[in-house]
């Protein structure tokens, strides 16, 4: 598997997590929608499924890890940034094969692509604190 396949899986997963957060739809329906309606060429489908399903099933646990580092309530965090931080927190917590620097860098790049103007700074700050606490 190429790193670019995982990068594409993360990119698709963040979009799917965002959609799931806003719609409240069943995660299986969101997964099906993204796999059938999006371009999945070069995407590590298994990794996409793991990230999406993992964030959905571990949402409460991930939010407990993230919340101490927020300066505002979780429900006030930008939905794009929330999706990115949840995805990265999942990787940092449950995918020990992914180096923490890779998980953080990928999250920053996703925030630059999808987030608000300074969203990447917010994401970086939260994840740096999370890594420092869990190392």
UniProtKB/Swiss-Prot annotation:
GO-annotated molecular function: RNA binding
An annotated GO cellular component: cytosol
InterPro entries for this protein: NusB-like_sf, NusB_fam, NusB_RsmB_TIM44
Pfam family, one: NusB
Presence of the UniProt keyword Manganese in the record: no
Record flagged with keyword Transmembrane: no
Physiological role: Involved in transcription antitermination. Required for transcription of ribosomal RNA (rRNA) genes. Binds specifically to the boxA antiterminator sequence of the ribosomal RNA (rrn) operons.
UniProt cross-references to PANTHER family, sorted A to Z: ANTITERMINATION NUSB DOMAIN-CONTAINING PROTEIN, N UTILIZATION SUBSTANCE PROTEIN B-RELATED
Homology family: Belongs to the NusB family.
The protein's name: Transcription antitermination protein NusB
The species this protein was found in: Shewanella piezotolerans (strain WP3 / JCM 13877)
